[in-house]
Amino acid sequence: MNDNKAWSGRFAEPVAELVKTYTASVDFDRRMAEFDIQGSLAHAQMLTRAGVLSETDLDAIRSGMHTILEDIRAGRFEWSVDLEDVHMNVEKRLTDRIGDAGKRLHTGRSRNDQVATGIRLYLRDAIDRIVGFVRGLQAALLDLAEPNAATVMPGFTHLQVAQPVTFGHHLLAYVEMLGRDAERMQDCRKRVNRLPLGAAALAGTTYPIDRHYTAELLGFDDVCHNSLDAVSDRDFAIEFTAAASLVMTHLSRLSEELILWMSPRVGFIDIADRFCTGSSIMPQKKNPDVPELVRGKAGRVTGHLMALLMLMKAQPLAYNKDNQEDKEPLFDTVDTLIDTLRIYADMMRGITVRPEAMRAAVLQGFATATDLADYLVKKGVPFRDSHEIVARTVKLAEVQGCDIADLPLDELREFSELIEADVYDVLTPEGSLAQRNHVGGTAPEQVREQIARWRQRLAHA
């Protein structure tokens, strides 16, 4: 029978209509069309060099593929579910256009290694774009951190006021996280950038192919060195999705803080209206929908990671149809991450800082208590003793409803005669910050140095 399939020759009846739609992937894998064409053109050039195809065949394939690519970009290409996937759609259109030369293109190649090559080309391109968007978000954070290098705010542990930091220093923590994220993506790219083409179905091919030449044409650093592994490996997709999950986790943490800081009870920041929505019933509401949705989408991306792990956990070598299910989680992860990074960079530039609210919060939580303990240690008091002294000082301030810095000197000296008038130099938020003038510290001078260091790194990234 002839069912218009590349493999229909050995079957006695056509595929059931429901099976066609159930097994087809063209509705979502068509996004790989340009990468599939790149791979096919390199394969054709290699086959010509090896003497398998003629120069006439190569010219016809190049011309046909160019026309197909134009049709796809212009939205004129008609995709067919009957042809299953992007690869067979492109091949059928090519054969219709150029005849036998199109039929020869698949020589020495299987859809197994063809698909694996297309995914790697797609993901390599996606990683390069994602790293660029990560850098863009880092730059936006630096733009907000720079004018707030000395803006006092409370640092928290257990969501309780702990010690004074600066808002710039707090933002730099996320710049550091994103820096690691970019490094992970770039490291993942090394393992993505290996060519499976030439592995054929699973055992290689009998044709005199030159895989290293194909790799060179496509910009791959190396070839996959085991044909079984080449067609069945999806580690690179899992690794990418794990790295993407970490990016989303970091942005989810920042989202949680933005939501908290924007709440009227805290009021540290305001987010521009264009990133918020209102309520259909409560006229006063301004809801931080973007950070809330980012927080939700972090779970979505992590779910894709779990889906890919479960997909691969029990597959025998080599290729199995299960692997068709790798694409939707992967594609959605790429889309979600890129959209999130782009919108986040814009949103950070739409944040208004409320320094007075931040400073007021510092003064409400005895944030300089540790500074008083350190002050006593420097006077010769063992730290555990100074800890006890300061704890009793805090109790007194609580009773009087004031900050430690508001206690008169004579009352402070009741706890230790080593306390002198210079203690007030360390009990203010600014005094506390100034003492932490070391690499990684929150002193404004250090914050400015870290901002300059990151700007230099991004300029050379």
UniProtKB/Swiss-Prot annotation:
Protein EC: 4.3.2.1
GO biological process: arginine biosynthetic process via ornithine; L-arginine biosynthetic process
Main location: cytoplasm
Catalytic activity: 2-(N(omega)-L-arginino)succinate = fumarate + L-arginine
EC top class named in words: lyase
GO cellular component, one term: cytosol
UniProt protein name: Argininosuccinate lyase
